[in-house]
C-alpha cells in the first residue's frame, strides 16, 4: 500500500509504475465509486495499491483479499451478473473465492503481511500514526516505511535547509538513504510547529466567532 498526500502525487507514482510494467490500482477521490472494491482487494498476494491518505479510511484491508468481493469478480469473469446469479452459482463462486483468499492469506502472512509505504511525512502526526495502523491490524504482521526528502513541503518550509546543510557537512549525496535519530527529531519538531500554527488558527476563528455571536444574538432578539 503506497500512500501519498495528494491526488497529483498518486497519479505521478502510478505513471512511474506503468513505465516499469507493474500492475497496480489507484485509489483517490477521482475513483471514489470503486473505493470499496479496491480496498477490499489491496491485501491480496502481490497486489500494489496507491492511495491518498484520506482514501479508504475506516476500512480494514484483509490479508489475502475479501472473498465476498472476489466471488462477485469471479462471476463477472464468467459473464454472470452477481445480482442475477442463481443460488448455486453464488455458492460455487463463494467456495472458490474462499479457497483462493485462504491460500493467498497464508502466502501473504509468510511474506510478512501488508507493507505500507508513506511517500512523505504529513503535517499531522495523527495521520502518520493512522498509516502505521494500516499494517499489522488485528494481530496480523505488517511493516510501515516512510520516505522523506528535503524537498518535501513539510521539510522545505520548516527544517529543510538545516537538514540539507547538515547532510552537506557530513558529505552525503542525495541518493544515499538516511536513517538517523536527528533527522527524525527534526521532522517531529516541524510537525509540532505546524500543529501549533493550526491550533492557533482554530483558536482565532473561535475568538472571531465569539465577537460575531454577540451581534447575532442582538439581531435575533430584535427579530
What name fits each language-model region?
Residues 18-200:
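Conserved phosphate-handling catalytic cores of large alpha/beta enzymes
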Residues 1-13:
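Conserved strand-helix element at the start of the C-terminal RecA-like helicase core
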Amino acid at each position: 500500500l503506497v500512500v501519498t498526500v495528494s491526488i497529483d502525487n498518486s497519479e505521478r507514482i502510478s505513471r512511474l509504475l506503468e513505465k516499469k510494467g507493474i500492475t497496480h490500482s489507484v485509489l483517490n477521490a477521482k475513483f471514489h465509486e470503486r473505493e470499496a472494491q479496491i480496498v477490499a482487494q489491496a491485501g491480496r498476494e502481490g497486489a500494489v495499491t496507491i492511495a491518498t491518505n484520506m482514501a479508504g479510511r475506516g476500512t480494514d484491508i484483509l490479508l489475502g483479499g475479501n472473498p465476498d468481493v472476489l466471488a462477485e469478480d469471479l462471476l463477472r469473469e464468467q459473464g454472470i451478473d452477481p445480482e442475477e446469479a442463481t443460488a448455486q452459482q453464488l455458492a460455487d463462486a463463494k467456495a472458490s473465492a474462499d479457497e483462493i483468499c485462504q491460500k493467498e492469506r497464508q502466502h501473504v502472512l509468510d511474506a510478512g503481511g501488508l507493507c505500507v509505504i508513506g511517500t512523505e511525512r504529513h503535517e499531522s502526526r495523527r495521520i502518520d500514526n493512522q498509516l502505521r495502523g494500516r499494517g499489522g491490524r488485528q494481530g496480523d504482521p505488517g511493516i510501515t516505511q516512510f520516505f522523506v526528502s528535503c524537498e518535501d513541503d513539510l521539510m522545505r518550509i520548516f527544517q529543510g535547509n538545516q537538514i540539507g546543510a547538515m547532510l552537506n557537512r557530513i558529505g552525503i549525496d542525495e541518493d544515499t538513504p538516511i536513517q538517523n535519530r536527528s533527522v527524525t527529531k527534526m521532522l517531529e519538531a516541524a510537525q509540532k510547529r505546524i500543529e501549533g500554527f493550526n491550533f492557533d488558527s482554530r483558536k482565532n476563528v473561535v475568538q472571531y466567532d465569539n465577537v460575531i455571536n454577540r451581534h447575532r444574538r442582538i439581531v435575533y432578539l430584535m427579530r
